[in-house]
């Protein structure tokens, strides 16, 4: 089989936009591990400046077409033609994946994309969370790297047990080097034990640790709450505990010592999995030593469809509590593929204009802004700013 193109992590998370949670069954995005580097400790009360954003080298259209052909099996000439008429490599990569998974032509997927978000496109293609996950696992197993240490059947077997492909391939490599079996090595990687630690346990040579002083997760922004923009830099314990209590409903007295032990991102992961699985925080903490986050979802019964439905319930509750948006409205539109923040903005603008959300929500496209939408429905720039400020205030952004 052709070598697998590295697909952005969010591609495997069907419900990206529902809750930007750490990982799912195929990948997403790569799940946050405890071994990730966080913000370096402050010196003299000050943190170093944020690092510049790293940009990928630009691909020529010919190079991009070759990658797409290799990843999905589409004709090189067709890929080059679509790139040459203005479609970006990023959009083409996503469109090819969705076309492959749905069985629809790439051109149809690109046409659906013009006025809509990718979440909406997935819904229009009939790619439910369950179907998306099943098809994506089959895709991963069919397009293994040329030097893959596992075959298609083995990869698919473990993918269906909640292990991400990267872990399966790494475990197979270490199993071969250590004389162990894949089944023995794969479960060794957990939330609290990364692959370098697994190597040490197996008596294998470890890679020299490199200093990554600016390896930030989310560039100092929150990554697990279904919206962007909440700054986690300079977070205080008091503020963090209030955020987690409001979002996940756990007791503040229980959250405080856990925040002091695990930090913001570590506790976010714990709260998210506990809330979605309806378990206690302590139960999830104990599972961290046994499973990776991806595998834990499988063990907890959080299939892609179940996880998505609970994400919908979660966001519907939050929008009802903070924005007075009826839960049935949020649930209806999230099931149609609209992201929570999209529903939020559309509903508030519609209210200001005396319209129904259905008359507003599709006016927002990938090529315009909510300010453009506001002006189109007879509102002013100030009206749009008021909506934006209300969302920021009620969700604690940029504090």
PLM region descriptions:
Residues 27-399:
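General marker for long, soluble alpha-helical cores
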Residues 1-4:
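Positively charged n-region of N-terminal signal peptides that target proteins for export
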Residues 8-18:
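Bacterial N-terminal signal peptides
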Residues 18-19, 394:
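Residue-level signature of transmembrane alpha-helix interfaces in integral membrane proteins
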